[in-house]
UniProtKB/Swiss-Prot annotation:
Origin organism lineage: Eukaryota, Fungi, Dikarya, Ascomycota, Taphrinomycotina
Cofactor: binding details: Binds 1 Mg(2+) ion per subunit.
Protein name: Enolase-phosphatase E1
Key word Metal-binding present: yes
SUPFAM superfamilies: HAD-like
Subunit structure: Monomer.
Family statement: Belongs to the HAD-like hydrolase superfamily. MasA/MtnC family.
Cellular component terms (Gene Ontology): cytoplasm; nucleus
Sequence positions that bind substrate: S117, S118, K151
Enzyme Commission no: 3.1.3.77
C-alpha cells in the first residue's frame, strides 16, 4: 500500500494564489512605498542595513526589487509594507477557489498543511490571515521561508521534514527545480499547473490543475 499523506507542504505564488496577484499587485505596491517607508523608518536597524542615506537605501531596495532578490532582510521589509496594506484594507490575498476546500478536507482528515515560500514568514501569515476567503490561519500548521534554506536545495526539505518520514509529505509547487530538490529528500511532489503559470513541458511529475482530487 502507498504511504498515506500526513502533511501537505504548499508553495504560495503560482500554487495556492495567482502569480499575477503577486507580480501585478503586491510587488508594485511595495515598490511604490519604498521611499515613504524608508523616510518613516530611517532609524530602524531593519532599514539601516541597506545603507546610510535615504537615497542610498531606496536605490538599494529598487535594485533588489528589480533583480527579484530573495534576500531575507529585503523580503522582511517588503512584508512590513504589505502588512500596512493588508491591515488598511488596500489589498486582500488571492487564492484559487479549490484551496479552501482542500484546507478543510485536510483538517477533517487530520492532515497537516504547511507553507514554504520565498516570502518571509510574517508575509506568509498575512497572506492567509487577509485572504479573499477570510482568515484561514487556523488551517496552517507551520510556515517556512528561506531562513531554513533555499527552495532549490534538498537539504532545506530535510530540515523541514526533520524526523518525520518524508514519504508522508506531499510538496506542491509550480517550480520544477523546487520539486527536484524535494524529491531528492524523499518527499512526494506534484506540479501546480495554474492560470498564468509558465508552461512546463515533460516535467515527469504529477500535474495538478486543480486540488479537488487531493485527499
Amino acid at each position: 500500500m502507498p504511504t498515506p499523506i500526513r502533511t501537505i507542504l504548499l508553495d504560495i505564488e503560482g500554487t495556492v494564489g495567482s502569480i499575477s496577484f503577486v507580480k501585478n499587485v503586491l510587488f508594485p505596491l511595495a515598490k511604490q512605498q519604498y521611499a515613504e517607508y524608508v523616510h518613516k523608518h530611517m532609524d530602524d536597524a531593519s532599514v539601516r542595513v541597506f545603507g546610510n542615506s535615504l537615497d542610498e537605501i531606496v536605490d538599494k531596495l529598487n535594485t533588489l526589487h528589480d533583480s527579484g532578490s530573495k534576500d531575507q532582510a529585503f523580503k522582511a521589509l517588503q512584508g512590513s509594507i504589505w502588512k500596512d496594506a493588508y491591515e488598511n484594507g488596500k489589498v486582500v490575498a488571492h487564492l484559487f477557489p479549490d484551496v479552501v476546500p482542500l484546507l478543510k478536507r485536510a483538517a477533517d482528515k487530520g492532515v497537516r498543511v504547511c507553507i514554504y515560500s520565498s516570502g518571509s514568514v510574517p508575509a506568509q501569515k498575512l497572506y492567509f490571515h487577509y485572504s479573499e476567503y477570510g482568515d484561514l490561519s487556523n488551517y496552517i500548521s507551520e510556515y517556512y521561508d528561506t531562513s531554513i534554506g533555499p527552495k532549490v536545495e534538498a537539504d532545506s526539505y530535510k530540515r523541514i521534514v526533520g524526523s518525520d518520514d518524508p514519504a508522508t509529505w506531499l510538496f506542491l509547487s509550480d517550480n520544477v527545480h523546487e520539486l527536484d530538490a524535494a524529491r531528492q529528500s524523499g518527499l512526494k511532489v506534484g506540479l501546480a499547473v495554474r492560470p498564468g503559470n509558465e508552461p512546463v513541458s515533460s516535467s515527469g511529475y504529477s500535474e495538478y490543475g486543480s486540488f479537488d482530487s487531493l485527499l
